[in-house]
């Protein structure tokens, strides 16, 4: 390969790209199958069966004449999900990105292109060489012109399982070699909790192993699912789920354990258990917990010994609770006025919890709202007052609803994976001169709107960098980020937006350069089974050959790195199977040291799976060692204790996050002060997809209402607006407007509508501010503000709106097919 340096390389890459564009219309022969061969590593079977896995579980694929025809759940899966039908359909969906595409305006004018027309579908098909040259040239241009602060590599999303084809890590690996980038901190799922919990209990907590389900079945007398719906959300996993939560849930049911669900919506978990159902107004959880805590103090019921021996700062919280500091005692009656839950119910629950072995299992939606840090902090405070933390079946848990939390752990080794190659930046001199190298991930729009502006985050103050390029893989920010219209406008600040995906998501449609990635089922990989259990290691074998011109993310980034003169550093001389073998061999070495024998790699790959035994994981009790001896087993907090009052947070001096759990009015809430709109939207996790994944598949036909995302509405609210079941409605507020299809049901409380998050944004006119979203992306309506200066998490659950029957012209949905130019 000819060696270029500096501006010569950049100029050569641009020359190749634009030369290819000039001949592409008359050179269709360049788009032949030869391009597929570059992405192939081990051939897929033409006919037969092959085991693989996904976010939805382990399965066996049937292949006939090179086409996958069926996905059959693993025989050891205790609760297979019907979403596997959509997983199969995703391979052949009409949303597939077939070829490398470049937005015509960008291809012709580069950084001088009109950015307001992003998303209009006007793309040009290009060759892989042209596309890769253009990507490499843009990365090099931005790095050389603006430095690493000009590149946002904090690409966020659920991607796909696999330790090699971890596209977000691969992106950062390439960008590190290219010169550095701005990263994102945290996530959208637990943005507030994962920042506040280390101050309170010394760990992230939201991703920690929970007291094992068998321990709960044996010891728990009252199981409380607070804003958690594990029957629904346990279908999926960050890695490959073993669905181990379901036997635990079934054991609780068989035992006759009393189950209470606190949620504005009648959830799948309520229905499964026939549970007692408490329906608070959304965003009022902290007030209810304070009312319970006040009852425990007023009736002299709380566990004073636990508070004295295992917590710090209760004496500073108590005056607030009792109203001595603000003349407002946080009584059950006070909490009832805010939450709508009867005061006597709040008192009865407090008495029940203290009298029985109680597990408070909280979900994450309660912290995805304004002042979301307070919810889990107050939950831990309430659990501390109950005094059962560290006892079998008691205390609190923050991940019983997520990826099989509580499923007994095995003694198997950890599986390593590809790394990002090191630090994200060139060094501290850049940080001092150009702002933060890491921003809170949900503040990406603030960053684009306010380059150079200061922002607070968890005790630090930094400046937003001036980002000119964003590179996104494995995610869908044009669905998962809040306040879509504001976001679309902010995205115009970017000179270049590059996306890899296998489907035409709303994010891909808004890109300048779109590269077709393979699905997980068109490449080889390796992954853990069970986020918490570590049940085994699965060979994720290629099921079918890559469709159209799709290539794996690894091959794409390796090719970009090669064009930047960093190919050897990126690949380290390994191909796909070489990396996979190295990860497995490392795990086998760990296993041998720990007394776990594993087969040689070739035998493992032939078998497809290795399983590990459960030893003592079924008896695990979270915080048991801390309870046994807090001096020998302290928490990772400054005091080593549960910090009900945090001196570190006090020193930060934030006006929106006091030093102890506090009720704080959100930006807007149902029946709250100055509420402009009458309905709260519960933007819940969907039942039939993973966030936005699988929305572009056949599964949508089973839940869409007249083609639109469903909107669950209470009969009284529907009748008051002249709305009937099945009507298409316009849901709107000051931030935007969307169409949805109504399902009238008493599963939602009056004053609340439920629209699942993850619906694909389908704007009527991308150039029109505030345009109507035709399908039903709820984040068009949600507020894009930080939870507080502490965590800066997202507030996707802080949203009020109004609903009216849609009487406008008929709309044609265009979001679930490829743009015409890309067909």
Swiss-Prot record:
SS bonds (residue pairs): none
EC class: oxidoreductase
Signal peptide: 1-42
Localization (cell): Periplasm
GO BP term (any one): anaerobic respiration
Reactions accelerated catalytically: dimethyl sulfide + a menaquinone + H2O = dimethyl sulfoxide + a menaquinol; trimethylamine + 2 Fe(III)-[cytochrome c] + H2O = trimethylamine N-oxide + 2 Fe(II)-[cytochrome c] + 3 H(+)
Keyword line: Metal-binding, Molybdenum, Oxidoreductase, Periplasm, Signal
Gene Ontology molecular functions: electron transfer activity; molybdenum ion binding; molybdopterin cofactor binding; trimethylamine-N-oxide reductase (cytochrome c) activity
Chain positions recorded as Mo-bis(molybdopterin guanine dinucleotide) binding sites: 156-160, 189, 232-233, 262-263, 283-285, 364-365, 368, 476, 480, 500-501, 523, 553, 685-686, 691-693, 779, 796-797
Keyword Membrane annotated: no
Cofactors, names only: Mo-bis(molybdopterin guanine dinucleotide)
Protein's UniProt keywords contain Signal: yes
InterPro entries recorded: Asp_de-COase-like_dom_sf, BisC, CT_DMSOR/BSOR/TMAOR, Molybdopterin_N, MoPterin_dinucl-bd_dom, Mopterin_OxRdtase, Mopterin_OxRdtase_prok_CS, Prok_Mopterin_Oxidored
CDD domains, per the entry: MopB_CT_DMSOR-BSOR-TMAOR (cd02793), MopB_DMSOR-BSOR-TMAOR (cd02769)
PROSITE patterns reported for this sequence: MOLYBDOPTERIN_PROK_2, MOLYBDOPTERIN_PROK_3, TAT
SUPFAM superfamilies: ADC-like, Formate dehydrogenase/DMSO reductase, domains 1-3
Coiled coil: none
One Pfam assignment: Molybdopterin
PTM entry text: Predicted to be exported by the Tat system. The position of the signal peptide cleavage has been experimentally proven.
EC numbers for this chain: 1.7.2.3, 1.8.5.3
Gene Ontology CC entries for this record: outer membrane-bounded periplasmic space
NCBIfam families: bisC_fam (TIGR00509), PRK15102.1 (NF011682)
Function: Catalyzes the reduction of dimethyl sulfoxide (DMSO) and trimethylamine N-oxide (TMAO) to dimethyl sulfide (DMS) and trimethylamine, respectively. The terminal DMSO reductase can also use various sulfoxides and N-oxide compounds as terminal electron acceptor in addition to DMSO and TMAO.
Protein name: Dimethyl sulfoxide/trimethylamine N-oxide reductase
Species for this entry: Rhodobacter capsulatus (Rhodopseudomonas capsulata)
């Amino acid at each position: 390969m000819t060696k270029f340096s500096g501006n010569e390389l950049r100029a050569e890459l641009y020359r190749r790209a634009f030369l290819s564009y000039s001949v592409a219309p008359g050179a269709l022969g360049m788009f032949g199958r030869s391009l597929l061969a570059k992405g192939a590593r081990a051939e897929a079977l033409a006919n037969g069966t092959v085991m693989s896995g996904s976010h939805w579980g382990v399965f066996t694929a049937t292949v006939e004449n090179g086409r996958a025809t069926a996905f059959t759940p693993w025989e050891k899966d205790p609760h297979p999900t019907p979403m596997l039908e959509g997983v199969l359909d995703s391979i052949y969906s009409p949303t597939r990105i077939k070829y490398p595409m470049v937005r015509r305006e960008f291809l012709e004018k580069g950084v001088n292109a009109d950015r307001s027309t992003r998303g209009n579908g006007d793309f040009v098909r290009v060759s892989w060489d042209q596309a890769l040259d253009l990507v490499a040239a843009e990365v090099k241009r931005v790095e050389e012109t603006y430095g690493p602060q000009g590149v946002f590599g904090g690409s966020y999303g659920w991607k796909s399982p696999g330790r090699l084809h971890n596209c977000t890590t691969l992106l950062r690996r390439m960008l590190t070699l290219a010169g550095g980038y701005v990263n994102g901190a945290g996530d959208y799922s637990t943005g507030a909790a994962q920042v506040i919990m280390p101050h309170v209990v010394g760990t992230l907590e939201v991703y920690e192993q929970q007291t094992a389900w068998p321990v709960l079945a044996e010891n728990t007398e009252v199981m409380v699912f607070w804003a958690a719906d594990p029957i629904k959300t346990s279908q999926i996993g960050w890695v490959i789920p073993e669905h181990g939560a379901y036997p635990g849930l079934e054991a609780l049911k068989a035992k006759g354990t009393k189950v209470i669900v606190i949620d504005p919506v009648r959830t799948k978990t309520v229905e499964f258990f026939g549970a007692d159902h408490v329906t608070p107004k959304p965003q009022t959880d902290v007030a209810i917990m304070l009312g319970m805590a006040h009852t425990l103090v007023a009736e002299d019921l709380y566990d004073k010994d636990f508070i004295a021996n295992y917590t710090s700062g209760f004496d500073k919280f108590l005056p607030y609770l009792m109203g001595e500091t603000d003349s407002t005692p946080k009584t059950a009656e006070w909490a009832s006025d805010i939450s709508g839950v009867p005061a006597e119910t709040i008192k009865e629950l407090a008495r029940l919890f203290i009298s029985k072995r109680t597990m408070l299992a909280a979900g994450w939606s309660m912290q995805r709202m304004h002042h979301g840090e307070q919810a889990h902090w107050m939950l831990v405070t309430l659990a501390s007052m109950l005094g059962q933390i560290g006892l079998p079946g008691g205390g609190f848990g923050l991940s019983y609803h997520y990826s099989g939390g509580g499923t007994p752990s095995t003694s198997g080794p950890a599986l390593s994976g590809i790394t990002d190659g090191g630090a994200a930046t060139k060094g501290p001199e850049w940080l001092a001169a150009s702002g933060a190298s890491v921003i809170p991930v949900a503040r990406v729009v603030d960053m684009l709107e306010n380059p150079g502006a200061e922002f607070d985050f968890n005790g630090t103050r930094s400046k937003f960098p001036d980002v000119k390029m964003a590179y996104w893989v494995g995610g869908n920010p044009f669905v998962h980020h809040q306040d879509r219209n504001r976001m679309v406008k902010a995205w115009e600040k970017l000179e270049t937006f590059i996306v890899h995906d296998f489907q035409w998501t709303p994010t891909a449609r808004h890109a300048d350069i779109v590269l077709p990635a393979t699905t997980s089922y068109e490449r080889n990989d390796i992954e853990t089974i069970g986020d918490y259990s570590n049940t085994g290691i699965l060979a994720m074998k290629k099921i079918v050959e890559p469709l159209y011109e799709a290539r794996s993310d690894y091959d794409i980034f390796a090719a970009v790195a090669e064009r930047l003169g960093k190919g050897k550093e990126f690949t380290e001389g390994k191909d796909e199977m070489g990396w996979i073998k190295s990860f497995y061999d490392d795990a086998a070495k760990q296993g041998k040291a720990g007394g776990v024998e594993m087969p040689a790699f070739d035998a493992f790959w032939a078998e497809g799976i290795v399983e590990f035994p459960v030893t003592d994981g079924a008896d695990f009790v979270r915080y048991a060692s801390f309870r046994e001896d807090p001096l020998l087993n302290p928490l990772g907090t400054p005091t080593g204790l549960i910090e009900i009052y945090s001196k570190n947070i006090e020193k930060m001096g934030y006006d929106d996050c006091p030093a102890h759990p506090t009720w704080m009015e959100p930006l807007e809430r149902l029946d709250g002060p100055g509420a402009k709109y009458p309905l709260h939207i519960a933007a819940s996790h969907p039942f039939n997809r993973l966030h936005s994944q699988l929305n572009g598949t056949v599964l949508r036909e089973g839940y869409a209402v007249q083609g639109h995302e469903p909107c669950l509405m209470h009969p009284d609210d529907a009748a008051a607006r002249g709305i009937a079941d099945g009507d298409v409605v316009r849901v709107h507020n000051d931030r935007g407007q969307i169409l949805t299809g109504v399902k009238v049901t008493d599963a939602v409380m009056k004053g609340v509508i439920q629209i699942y998050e993850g619906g694909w944004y389908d704007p009527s006119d991308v150039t029109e501010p505030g345009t109507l979203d035709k399908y039903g992306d709820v984040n068009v309506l949600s507020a894009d503000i930080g939870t507080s200066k502490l965590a800066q998490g997202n507030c996707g659950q802080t949203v009020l709106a109004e609903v009216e029957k849609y009487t406008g012209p008929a709309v044609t949905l265009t979001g679930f097919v490829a743009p015409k130019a890309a067909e």
